[in-house]
Curated annotation (Swiss-Prot):
Protein name per its UniProtKB record: Cysteine desulfuration protein SufE
Main location, first listed in the record: cytoplasm
Pfam families named among the record's database cross-references: SufE (PF02657)
Family: Belongs to the SufE family.
Domain of life, source organism: Bacteria
UniProtKB keywords: Cytoplasm
Lineage: Bacteria, Pseudomonadati, Pseudomonadota, Gammaproteobacteria, Enterobacterales
GO CC list: cytoplasm
This protein's pathway: Cofactor biosynthesis; iron-sulfur cluster biosynthesis
Protein localization: Cytoplasm
Gene name for this UniProt entry: sufE
Function in brief: Participates in cysteine desulfuration mediated by SufS. Cysteine desulfuration mobilizes sulfur from L-cysteine to yield L-alanine and constitutes an essential step in sulfur metabolism for biosynthesis of a variety of sulfur-containing biomolecules. Functions as a sulfur acceptor for SufS, by mediating the direct transfer of the sulfur atom from the S-sulfanylcysteine of SufS, an intermediate product of cysteine desulfuration process.
Length: 138
């Protein structure tokens, strides 16, 4: 994962933002740090349904059994939210992902109450899709 903070640093950085405008800008910046997704990975198999914007997420298991996540979106905030999810699932096995609840982290960040309903639904769709695919890999 290129230049993304770990979970604890994400939370620290997020709470240091003075207001929600700064927090949104930080989320967008995180999305800009994601590695470029290969064009061939932008296919129906990797499409996340339930998002208003176009979202693709690719999951691969490396030689050590760790899940590597890559993704892209045509919306900057959604791509940033994707980066947040990837940070939370970083260095986990498929089984770890299935059993890890990201919602307490979102509560610590006060994230969900500041998202529009459509973005919240899209965020949930990304999490459901990642966990469902992880369940098939575990």
């Amino acid at each position: 994962m290129a230049a993304l903070p770990d979970k604890e640093k994400l939370l620290r950085n997020f709470t240091r933002c003075a207001n929600w405008e700064e927090k949104y800008l930080y989320i967008i910046e995180l999305g800009q740090r994601l590695a470029e997704l290969n064009p061939q990975d932008r296919n129906p198999q990797n499409t996340i349904h339930g998002c208003q914007s176009q979202v693709w997420i690719v999951m691969r298991r490396n030689a050590n059994g760790i899940i590597e996540l890559q993704g892209d979106s045509d919306a900057a905030i959604v791509k940033g939210l994707m980066a947040v999810v990837f940070i939370l699932y970083h260095q986990m096995t498929a089984q770890d992902i299935v059993h890890f609840d990201v919602r307490p982290w979102f509560e610590k960040m006060a994230l969900t109450q500041h998202l529009t309903p459509s973005r919240s639904q899209g965020l949930e769709a990304m999490i459901r899709a990642i966990r469902a695919k992880a369940a098939t890999l575990s």
